[in-house]
Design a protein with these regions (language model features):
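Membrane-embedded alpha-helical core segments of multi-pass
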Residues: 90-103, 123-127, 152-155
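Loop-centered beta-sheet repeat module
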Residues: 114, 118-164
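Structural signature of hydrophobic alpha-helical transmembrane segments
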Residues: 16-29, 79-95, 139-153, 198-210, ...
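Helix-coil boundary and interhelical linker segments in multi-pass alpha-helical membrane proteins
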Residues: 7-17, 68-82, 130-142, 189-200, ...
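Juxtamembrane helix-loop boundaries in multi-pass membrane proteins
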Residues: 1-6, 40-66, 87, 103-130, ...
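Short loop/beta submotifs within extracellular cysteine-rich repeat domains
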Residues: 37, 72, 102-106, 152-153, ...
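C-terminal transmembrane-bundle signature of multipass membrane proteins
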Residues: 3-8, 25-35, 159-162, 184-283
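Membrane helical hairpin/interfacial module
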Residues: 12-77, 84
Length: 283
């Protein structure tokens, strides 16, 4: 999620944007290389329901790279072509993955198999709408947004029903962070449409903020627990929620102070998670 955070902070510092983008590439490329080299091992790991539902974040990062297509203006034609190709490959792979996951886990549906991270899986495709300002695929972004609304209506009640009936194990409580996924729907709406219907935007913002507060309630306990790669879900959704507020400020100016607070919190938690990743891989 460093790609998105770097782009957001680019409004305040171009240098900071480039630094975060560079760190994101340094972290992303080895991860992608490891996935390709150890595909068989990862394929076995993806048979785990929880791991499988979080995996799409790797593809979402591939789509987010396109926000850095202008990092070298003198090579724009080349970098734009590279990043657009990566965007399409990630987009197609994400749709294919959703189909495969659905066939595997929805065919014989069990409520106990549903985790909050299903929101990332099925709503994560909203990255295609978020990146419309860079891709120019406005019609695709609008179509995806309609899907996101429908997915949100089906997913949230299902997820909360699962949590109410079955709870969630302590060792995977970091998965609760993915409850912030509706914020991505708000960002998708803001980026894909020229005309914004304020009541709809306000409804999405209120919903995302309610879930954000829920995640913050559990965040201290999550961060105190033993680090695992699932912590990335925490940073991803907290940053998206802050980005949603940033866009909403153009329509509801009173949200600016709240946006700054959430951005700072997202940065602090990101630092904690990056440190955890460094220790995780060095050990």
């Amino acid at each position: 999620m460093l790609f998105s955070l770097g782009n957001t902070l680019g409004d305040y510092s171009t240098l900071l944007r480039d630094i975060l983008g560079g760190i994101a590439f340094v972290l992303y490329l080895p991860l992608l290389t490891a996935f390709v080299k150890s595909f068989k091992n990862y394929r076995l790991a993806l048979k785990n329901l929880l791991t499988a539902s979080i995996f799409p974040t790797l593809l979402m990062q591939g789509m987010l790279m396109i926000v850095y297509q202008d990092v070298f203006p003198e090579w724009y034609g080349f970098t734009e072509g590279i990043f657009r190709t990566i965007w399409w490959l990630s987009f197609i792979a994400l749709i294919s993955y959703i189909v495969i996951f659905s066939k595997r886990f929805l065919w014989n549906f069990e409520l106990s198999n549903v985790f909050p991270s299903w929101a990332v899986l099925y709503i994560g495709i909203g990255i295609s709408s978020l990146t419309v300002p860079w891709t120019g695929y406005s019609q695709l972004g609008k179509t995806i947004f309609i899907y996101l609304l429908l997915a949100l209506i089906v997913l949230l009640p299902t997820i909360f029903l699962r949590l109410w009936k079955h709870g969630i194990p302590d060792d995977v409580k970091s998965n609760l962070a993915t409850l912030c996924a509706p914020a991505l729907v708000a960002v998708a709406y803001l980026n894909a449409f020229e005309t914004i219907y304020r009541p709809l935007l306000l409804g999405l913002i209120i919903l995302s903020q309610m879930l954000y507060l829920t995640v913050l309630y559990f965040a201290p306990g999550i961060l105190k627990s033993l680090f695992n790669p699932g912590f990335s879900a925490l940073t991803f959704l907290l940053i998206v929620t802050a980005i949603a507020l940033k866009g909403a400020v153009n329509y509801f100016e009173g949200l600016y102070f709240l946006y700054v607070i959430e951005l700072v919190l997202a940065i602090l938690i990101l630092i904690r998670v990056v440190a955890g990743y460094i220790n995780y891989f060095t050990d």
